[in-house]
Amino acid sequence: LGGSFNNAGGLPRNRLAAIDLNTGVLTNWHAGYPGDGEVRTIVINEDQILVGGSFLNIGNASRTRLAALDPVTGEANSWGPSANNFVFTLAVAGDGTVIAGGSFTQINATGRNRIAAIDPVSGALLPWAPSCNNAVYHIEVAGETLYVGGAFTSISANTRNRLAALSLDANTPVETWNPNANNEVYQIDVADGLVYVAGAFTLIGPTTQITRSRLACLDGITGEPTSWDPTANGLAICVEVQDDKAFVGGTYTQVGGRPRNRIAAVNTLTGKPTVFNPNVNSTVYALEYKSNILYAGGQFTSAGGATRNRLAAIDVNTGSLL
């Protein structure tokens, strides 16, 4: 897990830590990061842990906002591209190419506006160079397509309001996919050919914008919103789809008109919130599902009426805290 913390489980851990999912106990893995920046994104790529953020040192080495760490020792390896501003998101394409998104305008001192492709072995910048006019917050890989969300309104001189589909074969966005959100998109998840998006938007649609309050489900080919319409009354910051449920985190206190404080599960067919209601007391920034357990990270200090400082594990079947 990554963030801006300097302590985990009562032990010193600067911005990165590893926790045993079976026991909930902090492991000995330590990335040796003394800096004041943040870790904003983590991706496992074969035998290395890729991280991005605002840091300038990590894994006992100088690394400028991008690094690859050894999963055993926490040491930085030789992979060390540099970004001149925040890296918010990392993804690995099917051919192994590392895709970075953020607010940067240079990678390895070469112009790349908010999105870039990087060689996974050498760290060299690759020729692919779409140009986004504002920040990229999330990149989701689905087959040969990269779905991109953020604050941008154009990519390579093509109008794309906060959402776009890209291919590594071209610098311009896919022409037929243009959902046209009226405000920022923070996260994307793809399931069964559908693209679930979470953000600050209230209108979305490629031809005629329709009301979708912070959550929407889009056709993966046309970009048209489906009938799925959960309606959150505050920001939806993250979305994680599993089977027939979309788990959503953010700042909201209602979903579908029902009380749901910052975490909810929404039926992917009906768009209605399920009975799952962990009730956390502050913002949720990240959700991860594994083996019927939902892991949540954020600013909260309680969940389900119990003390949980910034991390919680919740049984998705019972709603009980672990």
Where are these regions (language model features)?
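Extracytoplasmic surface signature
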Residues: 1-322
